[in-house]
Amino acid sequence: MSLIPYALTRPFLFGMDPESAHDLTMNLMAKGQNTLLQQAWAQPMVSDPVELAGLKFPNRVGMAAGLDKNARCIDALAAMGFGFVEVGTVTPRPQPGNPKPRMFRIPERNALINRLGFNNEGLDAFLSNVKRSQARAQGKPMLLGLNIGKNATTPIEDATSDYLKALDGVYPHADYVTVNISSPNTKNLRALQSDEALDALLGAIAERREQLATQHGKRVPVFVKIAPDLDEEQVGVIAATLQRHGMDGVIATNTTISREAVKGLPYAQETGGLSGAPVLEASNQVIRQLRSALGSRYPIIGVGGILSGEDAVSKIRAGADVVQIYSGLIYRGPALVPETARAIAQLR
C-alpha cells in the first residue's frame, strides 16, 4: 500500500499542464526508485501467474508503453505491482517529438489526448537505462517489454531499416519486443498496417529475429501493436500477416483518432491520439475480432480504456490474455494496479 494516497497528490498534478506533471512525476520516480521514497507509490504484487508466448507472467496486468519512453523508471514501475512493464517507444536516434503543447486532459471523460511523436533520447541512452535496472539485475519477478519505432525523419519507405536497427539493440535486453506501427503521431506510420507494407516489414523482422536468436542463444518473442481505428477486414488481414511471419502476439490497441466520445468538450479537437475511458469499447471490439481471426491460443495483450477492475475483466472476456494500463494510472493512481490484477485473478 502506497504511503501517500493518490487522492492527495492528483489535485496538485492536475493543477499543472499535463506534460509538466508527467515530467515531474517521472523525475521523482527516477530519483526515488530503490530508496525509501519508493514507498510513496509502492503496491503489493498480486500473484496470478500465466504463461504466454513462452513467458511466465507473475500476474496479468502490465504497464503500457509511452509513460516511460526512456526506460528511466523500470524499478519504480515494478514496485507498483505490475506483472510486466513495457518501456519506449524508442527510436534509433534521439528526437524531440512534436511541438508543445502536445498533451491534453479531458477529465469529463477520464481521457487524454497526446501528439508527443515518439520524443525520446535515442537507443543508446535507452539501453544504458535498461542496464541500470536493479530489479532486472536482482531477478525480480517482472517481465520487461521494449517497444521500438521509427524516427520521424526516416522516410516511410525506409522504415524497415529503423525497426531493424532498434531490434538489434534491444533484443539482448528484452523479455519481449513490441513493434509499434500504430501511433497516430508519426506521419504515415499507420500506413505500415496496410497489407503489403506490413507483409514486407514483418518479413524483414522475422528474418532478423532468427539471426539474433542464433547470435544470442535465445528466442525473444515479438509482439505487434495495432490501432483501434480498423474495420473487421483490416483486422483479418493483419491477423493473417502476423501468423504468416511467426509473430508471437499482438497488442490491441493504441490510441484512437476518433473524437465521437468527447465531441464538444474542451481540447476534443486537438490533433493526436485519444486514450482513456472512451477507447475501451473500440479496443475491446478489435480484441474480439482478433480472437475470432487468430483462434483461441494466439497471445493477445489488451490495452485501452481500463480505469477499473471491471474494465480489465471486460478485456479478458473480449479475448485478451493479459492487459496493460496507462491513462487509468493517471486518473486513478497506483492502486489501480492491484485492483485490476485481483479482479482478473478472480476469473479463474
Curated annotation (Swiss-Prot):
It catalyses: (S)-dihydroorotate + a quinone = orotate + a quinol. The active site is at residue 183. It is a peripheral membrane protein. Its EC number is 1.3.5.2. Pfam families: DHO_dh. Its main location: membrane. Binds 1 FMN per subunit. It is an enzyme of class 1 (oxidoreductase). Pathway: Pyrimidine metabolism; UMP biosynthesis via de novo pathway; orotate from (S)-dihydroorotate (quinone route): step 1/1. Keywords: Cell membrane, Flavoprotein, FMN, Membrane, Oxidoreductase, Pyrimidine biosynthesis. It is found in: Cell membrane. GO terms for molecular function: dihydroorotate dehydrogenase (quinone) activity. GO terms for cellular component: cytoplasm; plasma membrane. Substrate binds at residues 69, 114-118, 180, 185, 254-255. Its cofactor is FMN. Belongs to the dihydroorotate dehydrogenase family. Type 2 subfamily. Monomer. Catalyzes the conversion of dihydroorotate to orotate with quinone as electron acceptor. This is Dihydroorotate dehydrogenase (quinone). It comes from Delftia acidovorans (strain DSM 14801 / SPH-1).
